[in-house]
Amino acid sequence: FLFFLFFFLKDVSWIDNLKLRVSYGIVGNQNGIGNYTTLGLADNKGYEFGDTFQMGYLPGKELSNPNLKWEQSATANLGVDFSFFNGRLNGTVEYYNTHTKDLLVERSLNASLGYTTMLDNLGKTKSSGIDLSLNGDVIRTKEFTWSLGTNFSMYKNEIVRIDDTLDENGKPASQVAQGWIIGEPINVYYDYLVDGIFQYDDFDITRDGTGNLVYTLKNTYDSNNDGVADSPIDYGGAIEPGMVKVRDNNGDGKITADDRVPIRKDPKFTVSLSSTWNWKGFDLFMDWYGVSGRKIKNSYLYDYNSGGSLRGKLNGVKVDYWTPFNPSNEFPRPSYSADPAYLSAIAIQDASYIRLRTLQLGYTFPARLLKNTPIHKLRMYATATKLLTFTE
């Protein structure tokens, strides 16, 4: 189809260039394989023998694997290069699809073997993406030109298989402890989804015999599937206002490790937009860059050593945390002795942003002013980077 389309478009006057590119290749990767990883090595160790210090050898600290081989990645590319309207609009569209097998991964071993891991060829992954590049002259006159350029990239990857282990359904098994989930991207967090902070309105509040407040979660779970909430969500412990509220993702009425979900770290797409103006020797260049859908775990919100955990360390208490007089729905109440529950889930934040990466203003001196000098061309400019960033 594409061949016939290109054939019929060859005489269209406004098309300067239209080129189809197709490629396929297989490449190898040996990163992680040392010079002697496939061999059984011995470590030189010293020991006391009587009154004499002797040198000897012990089995190496890493189990060798004589069957190691390169990773293999097979990639197919389909691209179109084009130029229209006497070069005023040009660009490239490209789609790629990659399948990788025999990934170099540290396999977990039973400690009774004397080793806990071994480098091995495991698993399969697949990835695909689209790259778009577009450049055009919006205005082109003798004294003034204005050009725009944009780049767009969207990429995703997925774990197909980790090893030969199967789950109870006979399908390739995930390894949750390592963050490797079948059908999910390679780079993910595995955590709870946060629905805010518990407020007073979430509880029925009473007093016990000694006058202390007793907080009982209101019924929000429909155990009979009849459309009527008849029981509270079971958090496995006491819940009070100011604590983190997480989602019962599997709908069983209980908050357990099974409610954790993979949360993609990598952005859904990236985009850039550049603009260049030229007028009577002056030029102005502006470059914007945006990232959408990226997730990060902010250590300053959960890690005690980095200032988080809301226990008064460094800047941890400077966030908008919950108190009875400031019922924030963003951060839990602080604690003097222990981290609030589910704090790591609170720390996962949307890292999408738009940034003015570069702003440059320049002036090129006319040739007539340089006529009697050894200088053939002179341009002065000032550049600023990362001037503005817009993010949540």
Language model features with spans:
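Residues on the lipid-exposed face of transmembrane beta-strands in outer-membrane beta-barrel proteins
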Residues: 1-3, 22, 78-82, 93, ...
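Short loop/turn motifs that connect adjacent beta-strands in outer-membrane beta-barrel proteins
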Residues: 4-18, 31, 85-88, 139-146, ...
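Outer-membrane beta-barrel and related beta-rich outer-membrane complex signature
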Residues: 11-13, 26-41, 103-107, 111, ...
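Conserved small-residue
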Residues: 34-37, 120, 137-261, 385
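Outer-membrane beta-barrel signature, preferentially recognizing the C-terminal barrel domain
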Residues: 48-90, 118-141, 181-197, 264-269
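Extracytoplasmic gating/loop element in the C-terminal half of outer-membrane beta-barrel translocons
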Residues: 230, 238-241, 291-385
